[in-house]
From Swiss-Prot:
It comes from Corynebacterium glutamicum (strain R). The keyword Cell inner membrane does not apply. Signal peptide: none annotated. Belongs to the RNase HII family. Its main location: cytoplasm. It holds the Pfam family RNase_HII. GO terms for biological process: DNA replication, removal of RNA primer; mismatch repair. It is found in: Cytoplasm. Residues 7-198 form the RNase H type-2 domain. This is Ribonuclease HII.
Length: 209
């Protein structure tokens, strides 16, 4: 695309859309056109081990012509909705690039409001290097946030499942209630938190009987 006068090309991707706790992170990245040996392992971040992502993240930042990461809190997700958070985050991530792109590639996501042409590519994080780089930046940033968050909220195992809806996670919400970092607009969180409230009310009633 750069050779066709549409460059530089930015890739955009998100991490955490399907989680029920913690933020969503959205990254944008512009890579040089030439192959980069240190980034040969780049592919969809979901197909990379945690250790590989950790190694790639500083290398992506080192070689990228420009990169940015936007983090949108669980509170804003509850307030505006995940779709709005995702789309606005992608626009903000592209706008935050030091070098403005002439074209944007997304991982199958339609994003109205870009100031330049864009193309959603199905499976783009596995086929376009700039999207793959963005996916690593987004996921590793979010994983680091969730690992730190586990220190503040140790009951949920956030360092393990990173806020996704595993059985262990939902059982913990039923037992301890949801934390301030949970997405209360998500039905599974609301239901589990309500079950905790109901159990707490029953315990109070029985204790006062």
């Amino acid at each position: 695309m750069s050779r066709n006068g549409l460059g530089p090309v930015a890739g955009v991707d998100e991490a955490g859309r399907g989680a029920c706790c913690g933020p969503i992170s959205i990254a944008a990245c512009i890579l040089p056109d030439k192959p980069i040996q240190e980034l040969a392992a780049l592919t969809d971040s979901k197909n990379l081990s945690a250790s590989t992502r950790e190694k790639l993240m500083p290398l992506i930042k080192k070689h990228a012509l420009a990169w940015s990461v936007i983090v949108i809190s669980a509170q804003d997700i509850d307030r505006f909705g995940i779709q709005h958070a995702n789309i606005s985050g992608m626009r903000r991530a592209v706008a935050a690039l030091d070098t403005q792109p002439g074209y944007v590639l997304t991982d199958a996501m339609k994003v109205p409001g870009f100031t330049v042409p864009y193309l959603p590519i199905i499976g783009g994080d596995a086929s376009a290097r700039c999207i793959a780089a963005a996916s690593v930046l987004a996921k590793q940033t979010r994983d680091d946030i969730m690992t730190d968050m586990a220190n503040d909220y140790p009951h949920y195992g956030l360092e393990i499942h990173k806020g996704y809806s595993t059985k262990i996670h939902m059982d913990a919400v039923r037992h301890h209630g949801a934390s301030p970092e949970h997405r209360y607009s998500y039905a599974n969180v609301a239901k589990a938190h309500q079950e905790w409230l109901h159990a707490a009310d029953n315990d109070t009633t029985e204790g006062g009987a």
